[in-house]
Curated annotation (Swiss-Prot):
HAMAP family membership: Ribosomal_bL31_1 (MF_00501)
Keywords, ordered alphabetically: Metal-binding, Ribonucleoprotein, Ribosomal protein, RNA-binding, rRNA-binding, Zinc
Name listed for the protein in its UniProt record: Large ribosomal subunit protein bL31
Cofactor: Zn(2+)
Function of the protein: Binds the 23S rRNA.
SUPFAM superfamilies named among the record's database cross-references: L28p-like (SSF143800)
UniProt superkingdom: Bacteria
Source organism of this protein record: Vibrio cholerae serotype O1 (strain ATCC 39315 / El Tor Inaba N16961)
Pfam families named among the record's database cross-references: Ribosomal_L31
Annotated signal sequence range: none
Underlying gene: rpmE
Organismal lineage: Bacteria, Pseudomonadati, Pseudomonadota, Gammaproteobacteria, Vibrionales
Length: 72
């Protein structure tokens, strides 16, 4: 490998919203990373059925166009 052309590869501490924390190596410029879901709290990996919704497109659509459908 050539010296001086590759990004710095360092340990990054990732913290999930559920409280789970782990360390991995990355070229990310920060020392910490905050996650919304991880393997401990994601429904696919945990086996628990819960809705993972960050309040997105459906609510925004209903807010913009919900009144129009009620008038018909």
């Amino acid at each position: 490998m050539k010296a001086g052309i590759h990004p710095e590869y360092k340990a990054v501490n990732a913290t999930c919203s559920c409280g789970n924390s782990f360390v991995f190596n990355s070229t990310l410029g920060k020392d910490t990373m905050h996650l919304d879901v991880c393997d401990k709290c994601h429904p696919f990996y945990s086996g628990k059925q819960r809705i993972v919704d960050t309040g997105g497109r459906v609510e925004r659509f209903n807010k913009r166009f919900g009144a129009l459908s009620a008038k018909k």
